[in-house]
């Protein structure tokens, strides 16, 4: 029986697009390709009978995909844009390449500024109360994560998060891996690799 359960977040829709159109949309561990101008209209036609995703959801997922650092990195002058079947079309213009570079810089600056703010806010709390100091093995784990390539991540939004979703928490000196365990109206509770439970705002998570 065909699965008609509706998608509930952008991540599911993007994964669906990479499966349906692998020559156009690429998974997070592969380089992205510049998309054809007007790709949304092509998607709307191809997925007209797809009950699991609405046009509104499709537009939101497409926006998240094209605003990811990985995608913005691929928008370079003369790179060929592709359609849903991977056929090359027009080249990326200098104007579009410049806009992508500007958007990428602004996005990175925003994430790193929030990371610094979290570090600054966490410092007094740490001085006042020591909470579950990680063992040496855990410290090594966190240290290893400091070299994580953030180009595949973007700031999370509350509505896109799902239970058991793997995320990165902007906590301390580097993003820390965590799993979403509870979603409330204002906060997101995550479980760190050390087993510690932390409540944060969605703006302190990247996906």
UniProtKB/Swiss-Prot annotation:
GO cellular component entries: cytosol
UniProt superkingdom: Bacteria
Primary site of residence: cytoplasm
Location(s), subcellular: Cytoplasm
One matching Pfam family: ProQ_C
SMART domains: ProQ
Transmembrane recorded as keyword: no
Family membership: Belongs to the ProQ family.
NCBIfam families recorded: PRK04950.1 (NF003434)
Identification of the protein by name: RNA chaperone ProQ
Source organism of this protein record: Psychromonas ingrahamii (strain DSM 17664 / CCUG 51855 / 37)
Organismal lineage: Bacteria, Pseudomonadati, Pseudomonadota, Gammaproteobacteria, Alteromonadales
Gene that encodes it: proQ
């Amino acid at each position: 029986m065909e699965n008609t359960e509706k998608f509930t977040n952008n991540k599911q829709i993007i994964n669906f697009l990479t499966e349906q159109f692998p020559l156009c949309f690429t998974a997070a561990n592969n380089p992205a390709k510049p998309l054809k101008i007007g790709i949304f209209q092509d998607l709307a036609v191809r997925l007209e009978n797809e009950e699991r995703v609405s046009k509104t959801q499709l537009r939101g997922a497409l926006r998240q995909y094209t605003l990811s650092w990985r995608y913005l990195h691929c928008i370079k002058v003369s790179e060929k844009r592709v359609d849903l079947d991977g056929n090359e079309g027009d080249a990326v213009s200098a104007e579009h390449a410049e806009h992508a570079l500007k958007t990428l810089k602004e996005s990175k600056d925003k994430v790193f500024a929030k990371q610094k703010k979290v570090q600054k806010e966490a410092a007094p709390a740490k001085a006042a109360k020591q909470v579950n100091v990680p063992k040496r093995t855990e410290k090594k784990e966190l240290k290893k994560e400091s070299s994580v390539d953030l180009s595949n991540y973007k700031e999370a939004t509350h509505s896109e998060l799902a239970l058991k979703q793997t995320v990165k928490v902007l906590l301390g000196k580097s993003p820390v891996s965590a799993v979403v365990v509870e979603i409330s109206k204002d906060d997101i509770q995550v479980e760190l690799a050390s087993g510690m439970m932390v409540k944060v705002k969605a703006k302190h998570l990247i996906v």
